[in-house]
Amino acid sequence: MKKEDRFKPAADRVLEGINSGRMQGVYASSAALQEVIFWFYNRRLMAELVDAVNFLVHIENLEWVGLTPEICLNAALLMGEYDVGPFDAYHAATAILRDKTILSTEHIYDKIKGIERIDPIEIMEKP
């Protein structure tokens, strides 16, 4: 997450909720790690890359879900049906095969049948 990202306050609150155990049953696709790696690599931010990945993989109470053949097949189908990019498709396929819920500010997930998107901004606004 960029330091100046407008979603940083919401992300910080969500991460704190996961780390503290207040938010339970939270998982993330390992594709998110790949996405972060590509983002930093493409900008040649190698030192920041290691720090970011190290931070993410050590978040307490966060389950990392690996890419499986079933997730990859579902992602490919979602890409064709909903015209979403590979990473969005991996995240959506993971959610569909788990609990059909995704935590994201991206409205692209609203058009994917069977997924309920939870906006982290709304979580931030709750006491």
Residue locations for each model-derived region?
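Short, well-structured N-terminal submotif of metal-dependent ribonuclease cores
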Residues: M1-A28, F40-N54, M124-P127
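Acidic catalytic patch
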Residues: K3, Y27-A32, E60-G80
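Alpha-helix capping/helix-boundary segments
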Residues: A32, I71, H91, I108-Y109
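Alpha-helical solenoid repeat architecture
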Residues: P86-F87
